[in-house]
């Protein structure tokens, strides 16, 4: 049985030990190279062909691909979208009669559906009980993955700075500063660029900050990232490891024609 005298002697030592452990964890938890710990592909229920297109590439990845049910903008109620940050002014028609006939999204349903899909997935990932350095790879369903992806990724990840918040494994019209042979530091300036959200890795501990920036929709998801995430440590792999299949029609383009 532990006496009061023992507690008096050893308590400061135990407390000091715990504080040292926490300090070491705090210092070194941020010095971890990016890793792909889970993979999520955003896919609409109706796009079964695109899902099969992604599944056929499963063998190129180190872990299993999970499917996230994407939001089909044309089927989304404006009221529900508003609760998730899409103001009525963005989703309603300029025609009052059309708005009275339908409560569905009537303006740019593809862009809004895409934005909601990414935000809802990120919000769900944020709720997961995983380590802070856990890496979530988010994909869209029109991707093309290099056949030697794992080999290249395992090599390139070692050259990505440990302060990473997001790593783009593919992007369009890159804007960045070269760090080494394969990695660029994302740069925000007046020139448009860094388009596309078809393949990006998110550090779990960064999700809270990202979601704060996505509280309200201000632009298509990739443009909003570019406009609002400049204070994060974002890196781009170039040449890309994952690209977009131009032969597959974009889900955004399919929905963009307004239907009432």
Give the positions of each predicted feature.
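Short, low-complexity, Lys/Arg-enriched N-terminal segments of secretory-pathway carbohydrate enzymes
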Residues: 1-8
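An acidic/histidine-cluster motif and surrounding catalytic segment
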Residues: 10-139, 143-260
């Amino acid at each position: 049985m532990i006496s009061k005298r023992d507690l008096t002697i050893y308590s400061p030592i135990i407390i000091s030990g715990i504080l040292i452990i926490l300090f070491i964890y705090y210092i070194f938890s941020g010095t971890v190279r990016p890793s792909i710990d889970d993979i999520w592909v955003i896919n609409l229920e109706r796009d079964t062909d695109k899902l099969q297109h992604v599944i056929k590439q499963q063998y190129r990845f180190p872990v299993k691909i999970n499917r996230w049910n994407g939001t089909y903008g044309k089927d989304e109620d404006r009221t529900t979208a508003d609760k998730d940050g899409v103001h009525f002014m963005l989703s309603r028609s300029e025609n009052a009669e059309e708005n009275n006939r339908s409560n569905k999204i009537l303006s740019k349903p593809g862009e809004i559906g895409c934005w909601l899909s990414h935000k809802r997935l990120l919000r769900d990932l944020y709720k997961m009980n995983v380590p802070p350095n856990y890496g979530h790879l988010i994909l869209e369903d029109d991707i093309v993955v290099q056949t030697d992806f794992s080999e290249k990724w395992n090599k390139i990840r070692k050259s990505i700075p440990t302060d990473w918040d997001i790593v783009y494994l593919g992007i369009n019209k890159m804007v960045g500063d070269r760090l080494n042979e394969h990695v660029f530091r994302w740069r925000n300036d007046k020139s448009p660029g860094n388009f596309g959200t078809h393949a990006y890795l998110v550090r779990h501990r960064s999700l809270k900050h990202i979601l704060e920036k996505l509280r309200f929709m201000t632009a298509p998801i990739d443009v909003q990232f570019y406009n609002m995430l400049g204070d994060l440590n974002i890196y781009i792999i170039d040449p890309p490891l994952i690209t977009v299949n131009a032969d597959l029609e974009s889900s955004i383009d399919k929905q963009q024609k307004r239907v009432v």
